[in-house]
Amino acid sequence: MKKLSRILLSTAALSLMSIGGLTGCNKGPSLNLKVGLILLHPAKSSTYDKNFREAFERAARELGFKAVIKENIDEGDECQATAEEMAEQGCGIVFADSFGHEDYMIAAARNYPDVMFCHATGVQARSVNLPNFYNAFASIYQGRYLAGVTAGLKLKEKYGDANGAVSDANAKMGYVGAYPYAEVKSGYTSFFLGAKSVVPNVTMEVTFTNEWYHESKEKTAAELLLSHGAKLISQHADSYGAPNACEVAGVPNVSYNGSTLKNCPKTFLVSSKINWTPYFKHIVDCKINNKTLEKDYVGSFTDGGVELSSFSKNCAKGTAEYVNNVKQELLNGTRHVFDVNTFTIGGQAPTEALVKPGPYTFTDYPEGTLFLEGGYYHESEFRSAPSFDVDIDGISIID
């Protein structure tokens, strides 16, 4: 308790500085509402947290709410202390951005029933069933898939023969992941399947850093994949480590959470990201107008919650038109990311038993829920956070 009290006092001072730092910039309407944002890492160095902060500040400018921002809050007691201090300061909504924040946000929600506590990437909103705790994510697997299509087109342009075929040696990609969680596995599988739709014999090695943000580990991981012959690299880790390693090596890179073109002008291709501004505006609308907020909110291309960056000049010729056509197929339902006809698991065709998520997800799925129906896996339809956590053929985990 003494430790928690010390954290509360330090958090109070820093959070108050956050209020003064941003609310003076609001040029839109003025709302009598404070909203708190808790970030795992400093936004200056983490592409993941930078994406959240920019979206939050954009929503604050457009709606006029008073923003409280606290960075570098670890996945422990400090998160609960920060969330509760924000509630004490009068925040009507508190949002946290990292998977490991969830238990501490739930604890804060129990103590402050009149405050809305919203959490990105979490999985427990339905099972804990608190009236003031919510999860949110987006169908980023579709964005990852399109980024993979972009990667496949680059491999085909760079290494394809007269018929467009790419040798096995050149059809090899690498992927730097943070943790072997469903969020990461779903993302790299989507990316891989997008590339596979263009280069059928593509393979991919994956290595994990076991940290969301560690620039030197991510750089070392990318260098390891390059030494194994990867001709293109992507990542689900939050620093510039992997993109910078690709820039030095002159190997194409597909980034995440935002463009790295400024840092990596010779090798950046495209980036997919979740645009959180629509969600921030949605939760504010629900709060001030007493509307019901979804327990599991899923953003999409349609509502602006999923985005691709501009394609760099390093992309293959015709990439933008090709990818846009694939995007339309995803949106109209004529193509599905996890189509069972496009991958196997241990040499077998996918079945419900092979792909059903494990019990660690904490979600109480209704009796009879089928994840594999109509010829594809229904990602992010039964909860907001990704659930696909199976290693498919063609992807090798090297850790």
Report each predicted region and the residues it spans.
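Bacterial N-terminal signal peptides that target proteins for export
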Residues: 1-11
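Core hydrophobic alpha-helical transmembrane segments of single-pass membrane proteins
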Residues: 12-19
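C-terminal motif of bacterial Sec signal peptides marking the signal peptidase cleavage site
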Residues: 21-24
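A residue-level marker of the well-folded mature domains of exported/periplasmic proteins
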Residues: 29-399
